[in-house]
Amino acid sequence: GVQIADDLQLTHAQKGFMVATPVLAGALLRFVMGLLVDHLKPKKAGAIGQVIVIVALFVAWRLGIHSYEQALVLGLFLGVAGAAFAAALPLASRWYPPEHQGTAMGIAGAGNSGTALAALIAPSLAIAYGWTNVFGLALIPLVAVLVLYMLLARDAPECPAPKTLTQYLAV
């Protein structure tokens, strides 16, 4: 945070908005991810979300972030990670009977702990390697998780039939 703010010469308001952007984007993009989950099934929608985040971090790492606006754009793409929660819940809960869905969703929700761990670890990594290299380092666990996800995650055998956009708008 501090290194980014210094390098980009951000005001306090810009720092606050930069930090809030992924959270706000994630909240808004959950609707879009929910549509993808219902139309493509949870596994495919979750994979698309993960690939979007990985590509965004790779581009930020290789090309760098040189302005406040670029930081906000990256924040929008990182918001997709938060939106992916809309894929995790049905992916987990549809496998279990109602009496076990709370536990399944609680375990799936623990996946959000990666954001907290990143917030704890990233500042130390930024000091040691430079803040733009943190984007590259973040790719290591993200790609590993994507590989495991693709190998191990399965859509439940009984998923609701996909709906058209017109059917959603009729609600």
Each model region followed by its residue ranges:
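Cytoplasmic helix-loop-helix junction between adjacent transmembrane helices
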Residues: 74-111
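Interfacial helix-cap and linker-helix signal at transmembrane-aqueous boundaries
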Residues: 4-5, 36-37, 124-129
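Conserved MFS/SLC helix-loop-helix module at the cytosolic interface between two early adjacent transmembrane helices
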Residues: 28-68
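A generic transmembrane-helix signature of 12-TM secondary carrier transporters
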Residues: 50, 54-58, 74-75, 139-146
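Flexible cytoplasmic inter-helical loops of multi-pass small-molecule transporters
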Residues: 151-171
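Residue-level signature of mid-helix packing/kink "hotspots" within the transmembrane helices
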Residues: 23-31, 83, 115-117
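Extracellular/periplasmic helix-loop-helix junction of adjacent transmembrane segments
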Residues: 1-27, 68-69
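Helix-loop-helix hairpin linking two adjacent transmembrane segments in secondary transporters
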Residues: 107-157
